[in-house]
Swiss-Prot record:
Pfam families: Peptidase_M76. The lineage of its organism: Eukaryota, Fungi, Dikarya, Ascomycota, Pezizomycotina. Has a dual role in the assembly of mitochondrial ATPase. Acts as a protease that removes N-terminal residues of mitochondrial ATPase CF(0) subunit 6 at the intermembrane space side. Also involved in the correct assembly of the membrane-embedded ATPase CF(0) particle, probably mediating association of subunit 6 with the subunit 9 ring. It is a peripheral membrane protein. This is Mitochondrial inner membrane protease atp23. It comes from Aspergillus niger (strain ATCC MYA-4892 / CBS 513.88 / FGSC A1513). Belongs to the peptidase M76 family.
Amino acid sequence: MSTSESSNNGSQPGNQDTGYIPGDDTWTQWRNIFSILAGRMTDEGKEQFRVARDIRNEVADCKRCEDQRDYLLQFSPIIRFMSDSIRQLGGDLHSHNIYCRRCTNRKAGGFDPDYGILICANEMKDQGHLEDTMAHEMVHAYDHLRFKVDWMNNLRHAACTEIRASSLSGECRWAREFFRRGQWKFTQQHQECVRRRAILSVRARPGCKDEAHAEKVVNEVWDSCFRDTRPFDEIYR
């Protein structure tokens, strides 16, 4: 096989063909999309396609994220409330420490006590998704200031703040689960979503042994942490 033929099939000599075709032109992008739709692209190829797309759209994604972030900081009721609650505890989250960046791992965002909030601009589906993500990370910031969370060494602390963030941010409300994630249950949907996302987050931490360990830790703190809606009077969304 010639070099050009190998390149057109998204593979190199000695490497398995993933179905991904490198290239930024419109025709190549459409060929990749049709390859995905036809089931001819492997999971590795799909990831290659996503990475190339994210790099190509990085400037536009970050600009859109920053514009929506600034709008939400000014007009979103939940974001403004969380900002005020954090400020009352001596913290300050604003456009200068809520960063929109392209992320290489598949997550929506993150919180670091020393730096602020990271929003993965290439993972944001729309402004509603960004609002949920900002609210989630702001709950972490609030918990860090109010409860002195030990992020590195205490899995129970991590589980508790993940339960609260998923419950209070709005990311587990019924409409979000139904239309975006394909979760069709009507009863106990909110609790199941919160539990599922908390277990996944705890499982990803270095101190967690396996999924059973993550589930055990979440169960140990579930009742008290799920009932704790501070700084809200009740679950807002």
